[in-house]
A protein has these predicted regions:
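Extracytoplasmic/periplasmic substrate-recognition and gating elements
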Residues: 258-261, 301-366
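Short, solvent-exposed loop/beta-turn-alpha elements that line the ligand-binding surface or hinge
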Residues: 126-139, 206, 223-247, 300-304, ...
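Hinge/lid segment of periplasmic solute-binding proteins
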Residues: 110-164, 188
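Conserved N-terminal structural module of periplasmic/extracytoplasmic solute-binding proteins
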Residues: 2-114, 119, 131-134, 362, ...
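Extracytoplasmic/periplasmic solute-binding protein
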Residues: 154-158, 164, 188-241
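Short helix-initiation/N-cap motifs at beta->coil->alpha
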Residues: 82-91, 110-111, 184-189, 265-280
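Glycine-centered hinge/linker elements that transmit conformational signals in sensory
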Residues: 193, 234-266
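C-terminal capping/gating helix-and-loop segments adjacent to ligand/active sites or protein-protein/ligand interfaces
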Residues: 369-376, 388-442
């Protein structure tokens, strides 16, 4: 992976919230927003064109390549339209129910498309899958299921996966006589030892808020299993007030009370390189972060990345209901289809290319890790084969891959969710306050 990959991952995966903040529902205006042609799902019928709308960033090189491949053999031609990343979600909402709507569009699955499903704008892909089972079977199930809503499939993975891993500074651990923690108790012990040596145990970009959320996602999964969050997301507000929720919050408080993150983590950010620098310079031993941490370190601290950057799965919790192989993070990005497309057969043919060898090799070439079953055949060609293999095995073996909470919920829930987790970590609200805040989130 390279510096470009770091920007791609932290951009398309995390920065959607700036675009979403002012866009809490569907805006049914008539403003065109596509970056190339002004066609649409409805107006392109006679011209034999399908419009593919994507998040505008450097990853578009692969998307353009795949569109060009499709156009070599298809009578119906595909046109790639882009919206600059910072404007993507808001402008998509503006055009999604207008004549300027695309046939196919980029999204994050989960909550990012739930409002469109609710408004009956998307085409379930189940009929396409019945005709071509490969549209489902050629993808890792834990990833594909992120775009399944109410039992129907609404998306095909189209970029790379981004699991959250526990990164470490191998030199710091060795000097402290510690090894990578396998269990929660191991982690708590490591925190105490590192604190005693004057080292901040865990780097945390609390100023960004979303890095803190990763701790909640894993602890809740390890302790309660994935069903607690699934029930909450489905509208069962009592899930947050159950015994398992209380235990998970107790574990998180145990971590903060032990001083695991130091005293000023809310003034540190990942996005400006602050928390990665703490890890690289040996001022912290661990950082829980998405897989883009690796390429971030390769870019900013190449010697550290080459020699001393370690990574592992999140520790298990003794007696917990969650499988130690469960993963959280950003499962992938997806292509979804507008119900009013005039060329569903052409769209189906286009989507088939998302599991082609060409697609896999092209994504690996820019530092992404595709989630197709044939990806394993090409991992040796990636920029960091060992790291890619570790991630792929982790995702492939995961019984559950929980999409980040702030992406599983609809966009309007992101800010109150981030505020709730920050206040709990800061000690400004107790468990009851956190539970009340989570029960107040809108899941529609």
């Amino acid at each position: 992976m390279n510096s470009f990959s770091a920007r791609l991952r932290s951009g398309a995966s995390r920065n959607r919230f700036a675009a979403v903040a002012a866009t809490t529902g569907l805006v049914l205006g008539l403003t065109a927003a596509c970056g190339s042609s002004g066609g649409s799902a409805s107006s392109s019928a006679g011209s034999g064109v399908i419009h593919v709308l994507v998040y505008g960033d450097a990853g578009n090189t692969v998307e353009k390549q795949i569109v060009d491949t499709f156009n070599k053999t298809s009578k119906v031609k595909a046109v790639l339209d882009t919206i600059p990343g910072a404007d993507y979600q808001s402008k998509l909402n503006t055009i999604i129910n207008t004549p300027q709507a695309p046939d196919v569009f980029f999204n994050w699955g989960g909550g990012s498309i739930a409002p469109y499903v609710k408004h009956n704008l998307l085409l379930p892909l189940d009929d396409m899958i019945a005709k071509d089972p490969g549209l489902k079977s050629n993808f890792l199930p834990s990833v594909f299921n992120t775009a399944v809503i109410d039992g129907k499939s609404y998306g095909v993975p189209m970029r790379g996966t981004q699991p959250v891993l526990l990164f470490n500074n191998k030199k710091v651990l060795a000097s402290a006589g510690l090894s990578v923690p396998k269990t929660w108790d191991d982690l708590i012990n490591d925190v105490k030892v590192l604190k005693g040596k004057g080292i901040t145990p865990i780097a945390l970009g609390g100023g960004d808020q979303w890095p803190t959320l990763m701790w909640f996602e894993y602890v809740f999964d390890r302790l309660a299993g994935p069903d607690l969050f699934r029930k909450a997301l489905a509208g069962d507000k009592s899930a947050w007030s159950g015994a398992d929720s209380g235990k998970a919050l107790g574990m998180l408080k145990q971590l903060t009370d032990a001083g695991a993150f130091g005293s000023n983590f809310d003034s540190v950010k990942f996005t400006d390189g602050g928390s990665p620098a703490l890890l690289a310079k040996g001022k912290a031993a661990f950082e829980l972060m998405g897989s883009w941490e690796y390429s971030t370190q390769q870019s900013g601290n190449p010697d550290f990345a080459k020699n001393d950057l370690g990574y592992s799965a999140f520790p298990s919790v003794q007696g917990g209901k969650g499988d130690p192989k469960d993963v959280v993070g950003n499962t992938n990005n997806f292509y979804s289809v507008l119900k009013k497309t005039k060329h569903p057969d052409a769209v189906a043919a286009f989507l088939k290319l998302m599991y082609s060898d060409e697609f896999v090799k092209a994504q690996l070439g820019i530092g992404n890790l595709p989630t197709t079953t044939n990806t394993a055949n090409f991992l040796s060609t990636s920029a960091s084969p060992d790291y890619s293999q570790f991630q792929f095995n982790l995702v492939k073996q995961a019984p559950s891959f929980q999409l980040s909470w702030d992406q599983a919920y609809p966009p309007a829930a992101a800010t109150p969710l981030h505020t709730a987790i920050q206040k709990f970590f800061d000690g400004k609200t107790d468990a009851d306050g956190f539970i009340h805040a989570m029960q107040s989130l809108s899941n529609s």
